[in-house]
Amino acid sequence: MKIVKISPRGYCYGVVDAMVIARNAALDKSLPRPIYILGMIVHNKHVTDAFEEDGIITLDGPSRLEILDKIDSGTVIFTAHGVSPEVKQRAKEKGLTTIDATCPDVTKTHDLIEAKKAEGYHVIYIGKKNHPEPEGAVGIAPDIVHLIERADDLKTLEIPTDKILVTNQTTMSQWDVQHLMEDIQKKFPTAEFHKEICLATQVRQEAVAKQADVADLTIVVGDPKSNNSNRLAQVSQEIAGTKAYRVADVSEIQLEWLQGVENVAVTAGASTPTPITKEVIAFLDQYDPMNPATWERVRKVPLQKILPRVKVKKEQ
């Protein structure tokens, strides 16, 4: 079996920055304990499990405000997906120490929404409902931001001004966003468009679109909650025309997927630890359908190998 290692793949700078911020927090003895992450720091359970070993507690729930209600003391880390001003204010009122690990690309979108609100605009925001990134973006100005996920959402959308800005969740499929923007243009011809697909998401999607078409199958390594991982599988199937499966790690690979497969492409979401992806590639590389000794699919990567290394500051 030939392995097509799609490049680029895996971690983006926003994810690495967020994890380094959280690791440094774990090592900082001056921070009030306990230390919580408000939601998953990035959408990967292997990462959150590794942080649990570091003594950082991940709390998840329907919304950031509801999660925050569970916390009465200590330190709170805001995830790479960003949070609303209301969440920041609530944390301040509760006397919590806060650390912001918001991805710079997400912050840029928040700043854009604030600027356009000041100019009297309404904002159409293309994103996934119940995902933390749109939750934070809508929370910047809930009175003028309208979340849409699909074309059907436009049917009932009415906006009381011609001053309209259209932007989007950074991890969406660029093709889906483009199609929705075309639909929006038809209904709101005066709308201004500001596509915010982050560069890391864009180049990973384009790599799959261009490189997966030579494969019989694409394996996307990523957490089920990772929107960008799910979009990579979608791009493989809809743009490259190659059947795709998303797996959290090697243990989720089904042998029947590999029947008759000669070329398999492998990519990974922006929040997927590199050792987890390498383990998937190693399994596929040695797999022989005629040799049961090569069929074992067990994740063996230790949690201490999941997180990026940080330098421990020496005490003065």
Curated annotation (Swiss-Prot):
InterPro entries in the cross-refs: LytB/IspH (IPR003451)
Co-factor binding comment: Binds 1 [4Fe-4S] cluster per subunit.
Cystine pairings recorded for this chain: none
Molecular function GO labels: 4 iron, 4 sulfur cluster binding; 4-hydroxy-3-methylbut-2-enyl diphosphate reductase activity; metal ion binding
Catalytic activity annotation: isopentenyl diphosphate + 2 oxidized [2Fe-2S]-[ferredoxin] + H2O = (2E)-4-hydroxy-3-methylbut-2-enyl diphosphate + 2 reduced [2Fe-2S]-[ferredoxin] + 2 H(+); dimethylallyl diphosphate + 2 oxidized [2Fe-2S]-[ferredoxin] + H2O = (2E)-4-hydroxy-3-methylbut-2-enyl diphosphate + 2 reduced [2Fe-2S]-[ferredoxin] + 2 H(+)
Class in the EC hierarchy, top level: oxidoreductase
Record-listed (2E)-4-hydroxy-3-methylbut-2-enyl diphosphate binding positions: H43, H81, H131, T170, S226, N228, S271
Cofactor(s) the record lists: [4Fe-4S] cluster
Biological processes per GO annotation: dimethylallyl diphosphate biosynthetic process; isopentenyl diphosphate biosynthetic process, methylerythritol 4-phosphate pathway; terpenoid biosynthetic process
EC number of this enzyme: 1.17.7.4
Positions with a binding annotation for dimethylallyl diphosphate: H43, H81, H131, S226, N228, S271
Residues reported in the UniProt entry to bind isopentenyl diphosphate: H43, H81, H131, S226, N228, S271
Pathway assigned to this chain's UniProt record: Isoprenoid biosynthesis; dimethylallyl diphosphate biosynthesis; dimethylallyl diphosphate from (2E)-4-hydroxy-3-methylbutenyl diphosphate: step 1/1; Isoprenoid biosynthesis; isopentenyl diphosphate biosynthesis via DXP pathway; isopentenyl diphosphate from 1-deoxy-D-xylulose 5-phosphate: step 6/6
Pfam families listed in its UniProt record: LYTB
Alphabetical keyword list: 4Fe-4S, Iron, Iron-sulfur, Isoprene biosynthesis, Metal-binding, Oxidoreductase
Binding-site positions, [4Fe-4S] cluster: C12, C103, C198
Keyword Repeat listed: no
Active site feature: E133
Role according to the record: Catalyzes the conversion of 1-hydroxy-2-methyl-2-(E)-butenyl 4-diphosphate (HMBPP) into a mixture of isopentenyl diphosphate (IPP) and dimethylallyl diphosphate (DMAPP). Acts in the terminal step of the DOXP/MEP pathway for isoprenoid precursor biosynthesis.
Family, similarity comment: Belongs to the IspH family.
Protein name: 4-hydroxy-3-methylbut-2-enyl diphosphate reductase
Source organism of the structure: Bacillus cereus (strain G9842)
